[in-house]
Amino acid sequence: MTAIVEPTWEERRTPEAAHEDDARSQYRKDYSRIIHSAALRRLQTKTQVLGLGDSDFYRTRLTHSLEVAQIGVGILLEIQRRFAGSNIEKYLPDERLLEAICLSHDYGHPPFGHGGERALNFAMREYGGFEGNAQTFRILSKLEKYSQNSGLNPTRRTLLGVLKYPTTYSNSMTNDFRRGTDIDKYPDAELKPPKCIYDCDLDVLDWVLKIFCSEDVTEFKKLDYKCKPLHKSLDCSLMETADDIAYTVHDLEDCIKLKLINREMWDAYIKSADYSEATRLEIEKWNQRIFSKEGNLVKQGISNMVYFFIHSVIQYEHEELSHPILKYGFKLGEEAARLRSAIQKIITNEVIKTHRVRVLESKGQRMIFSIFGELVRDPESFLPRETLDKYNKATGNLRMRVICDYVSGMTDEYATKTYQRFFTPKFGSVFDV
């Protein structure tokens, strides 16, 4: 009689032979695979805020991911200090596990940011859609080169950590795209994908959640009235909080450096009277530094902001869930969250929604949709050999998924060149790759 093997956190979907002379933990192995992955390298040419420029100062998705990992560990260390000896402490991730989760959280970010995401979601509307976080989950578990069919073949807990939305596209999709096949007829809000994983990756989700009791799995997958998942794991909450801190503070730094945001704009949005005395003093400290002409003072101000947000993290509980890794989570405290939202509103209104950035995003959206259309029209002629082999082996909707995987993996620069080779007269040669 075969013994039943209980699932574990360090288990991988495809079993691997152990090396006796390998001193690394399973999570260190995950971290190593992510560090050396092509998906991580591609993030170096995907900009964090579209259109900020080509200077080596401005952040890319790669530098952002590195900063998320560092902030994530900072939050973890603060929590370990604060909860030393408590029941929660033994369920906290180790540093390498959290770094692995944070480093890979943007794997699925498509070319041209949200414009690219909207274009691919519309192009895939009849074939399972597209969503950046769903693509991250797919890259880690199926696409990235390491194993035959399991991507990087990461541990169960690493996959759970990047799983922001534990529901499928078909369960959460609310838009039926009744306006027809012309993408230009749809406002951006109608092109946005639901927060999900793909239906074709449900097998991985089921495997990840196999470690929990059926009651927890049912509750964990529940959606709110907007069809958005209600829950995420402890590790994912740490990653998401670090991500929120990183992109808010560091996008602000880039925008100040570019002179897109000035002190007058800041004062118009950040009303210190709206906050407690301790937070008002903190804001005043930032005011004296982040707009200084001295680079060292600016950097100190940005560091002060990160420190403030890290030390504002609080613990929460979902009483409906029983397993501690689903039950417990961490987020910014109410006042810190309100302040972060105010800072993000400056960036959104004064930079991201400006004509300059919106034109670039719209252009990127059109380019990605056009590239996808050409590849679908004649995959035999236009897909690279390796991708074409996958396409020919796939059936049904999965053929379109192969094309979507290929386009979403392009960098901004490669997508631009691909578009030009298709549509710009006299551009390109047989030597282009």
UniProtKB/Swiss-Prot annotation:
Residues 61-248 form the HD domain. GO terms for biological process: dGTP catabolic process. GO terms for molecular function: dGTPase activity. Pfam families: HD, HD_assoc. Keywords: Hydrolase. InterPro entries: dGTPase, dGTPase-like, dNTPase_2, HD/PDEase_dom, HD_domain, PHydrolase_assoc_dom. SMART domains: HDc. It comes from the Bacteria. SUPFAM superfamilies: HD-domain/PDEase-like. The keyword Membrane does not apply. PROSITE patterns: HD. Belongs to the dGTPase family. Type 2 subfamily. HAMAP family: dGTPase_type2. PANTHER family: DEOXYGUANOSINETRIPHOSPHATE TRIPHOSPHOHYDROLASE (PTHR11373:SF32), DEOXYNUCLEOSIDE TRIPHOSPHATE TRIPHOSPHOHYDROLASE (PTHR11373). This is Deoxyguanosinetriphosphate triphosphohydrolase-like protein 2.
